Amino acid sequence: MSELIVKAKKLKQAASQLAMLSTEEKNNALAMIAEALIAQTGYILQENEKDMEIGKENGLSPSLLDRLQLTEERVQQIADGVRQVVDLPDPIGETIEQWTRPNGLILKQIRVPLGVVGMVYEARPNVTVDAASLCLKTGNAVLLRGSSSAIHSNKALISVMQQALKQSKIPTDAIQLLEDTSRETAQQMFRLKEYIDVLIPRGGAGLIQSVVENATIPVLETGVGNCHIFIDDSAQKEMAIDIVINAKLQRPSVCNAVETVIVHKQWPYIKELLETLHEKGVELRADKQLADTYPFVHEAKEEDWATEFLAPILAVKLVETVDEAIEHIERYGTKHSEAIISECNEHVEQFFARVDAAVLYHNASTRFTDGEQFGYGAEIGISTQKLHARGPMGLRAITTTKTLVYGSGQVRK
């Protein structure tokens, strides 16, 4: 029997036990995980360094290495994320709606776990803990399939969490790492309907497309982030420049970083914006007018408008109207996060009404599209689809509903 089937069976059994636990029992287990992560930071960093060395030897890009790397501070942040999940209200068992029918039947819709969640993700070890903590809080067992580039880090994190669970009421089998990272085993996982209730892919476009196209299990699709900021002609100079710098440079390798800035031609501070970005080391790829005007600006190619750079590279486009900006976003956006910087309420309302994305911003950075920033605690992913969940997915996104019907002998006539 393969590793996949053995672990999937254990997860299915663990899920039924996990669903019966109280909020207090789940919270106690999560608190133990947070403590264990801090206590075992040295071991975790030692294993992460193995992945980093192999990644450098294999020529991983700086953005992928950044996602892969763990530091003492990042492990602390991961543990803090688990503690935040402890503090969040438990959605399991909550009554969503209750009503009585004319025949006396009382119906109550409640929130329940999904069962077994399958996570498929790339070189981001923090996802291992984020996903596990959210799943355990909501009574779900979780099968984690990370990338081969993070295998030592993921094995260390799972080992630390499972050791912590031994002191709790949560079965250690409730979190499992699929150590076989081969494509063939991944394809089998995508079709394991008998054991897995939902798949959640987190990663690049290739990974997400592979899961969506090959899975027979329902998929909660997370999307790539080709995010835009539109600077309207009324935008305040300092605000616009600060927001663009933050959205591009605070952490360029993440999906909520801005990739294209669209600027109204009548905005008077284009020169200052471009010079500031250039001084901060951003490679600028813009339309011909800007490339001809500024020697440090490269002319953009068609594919640049559709690229999630995940690096200090920014596409810049000039437009004459808010309509033109919206049309550009409609053509190239990935329905993730889009922003408008403007003092014109009419333009903001138009932008909010017409742009189709999970999260829209007015006068704020796209970097806030994040479960923790939204107050959800650690997120399971950012959904760009429209069914079941959209935007940063917190606890409620990995639950489903059950309707309880209370009768007194009613039969249907």
Curated annotation (Swiss-Prot):
Recorded metabolic or biological pathway in which this protein acts: Amino-acid biosynthesis; L-proline biosynthesis; L-glutamate 5-semialdehyde from L-glutamate: step 2/2
Sorted UniProt keywords: Amino-acid biosynthesis, Cytoplasm, NADP, Oxidoreductase, Proline biosynthesis
GO biological process, one term: L-proline biosynthetic process
This enzyme's EC code(s): 1.2.1.41
Places the protein is found: Cytoplasm
Single GO MF annotation: NADP binding
A Gene Ontology cellular-component term: cytoplasm
One Pfam family cited in the UniProt record for this chain: Aldedh
Highest taxon of source: Bacteria
Catalytic activity: L-glutamate 5-semialdehyde + phosphate + NADP(+) = L-glutamyl 5-phosphate + NADPH + H(+)
Family matches, as PROSITE patterns: PROA (PS01223)
SUPFAM superfamilies (alphabetical): ALDH-like
Family, similarity comment: Belongs to the gamma-glutamyl phosphate reductase family.
Free-text function comment from the UniProt entry: Catalyzes the NADPH-dependent reduction of L-glutamate 5-phosphate into L-glutamate 5-semialdehyde and phosphate. The product spontaneously undergoes cyclization to form 1-pyrroline-5-carboxylate.
PANTHER family in the record: DELTA-1-PYRROLINE-5-CARBOXYLATE SYNTHASE, GLUTAMATE SEMIALDEHYDE DEHYDROGENASE
Name this protein carries in UniProt: Gamma-glutamyl phosphate reductase
Species for this entry: Anoxybacillus flavithermus (strain DSM 21510 / WK1)
